[in-house]
Amino acid sequence: VEEGDTEAIVIQRMVAQLDSTLTELDIEGRAQALGLTPYQLLTVASLIEEEAGTDEDRPRVARVIYNRLAEEMPLQIDATSCYVKNEPGGCRLTEADLASDSPYNTRNRQGLPPTPIASPGRASIEAALNPADGDWLFYVLDAEADDGSHFFTADIDEFNQARARCREAGLGCG
């Protein structure tokens, strides 16, 4: 952003950069190979953008999303409900938020939310296009890590144990 730039100029540059990135990454063809539209792929990338604590987590979060979609499980991504609340600087979800029938409440709805919830960066788009290999269905902040990374598992009991450790550490794990 340069001094004197208007909002319109900044937005035009952002759109041009995104268009260039999407063309370079062949999002049309590669999304289709994943069984998604480009818009759905950008929605997945936006979820990754909001959820991943580290760059290393991005492809793993992508894999969890795709695995849960394949299993017809709700995504249970709290960031989608936080998007609706529009609370800058963090979000604390209430029981009412989690019970909401909002189309963005992926706790109780299957499939992707109706729109992206953030503007994904290139790393999140690449992760959506290149998910890690794995059978994971769950992830939670890793209470033993200090870098914002997550613990990934396919086992609900392991997940519940990791979530309990996360809560004990005061990390606000759902």
Language model features by range: what are they?
Residues 1-174:
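Bacterial extracytoplasmic/cell-wall-associated proteins, especially those involved in peptidoglycan
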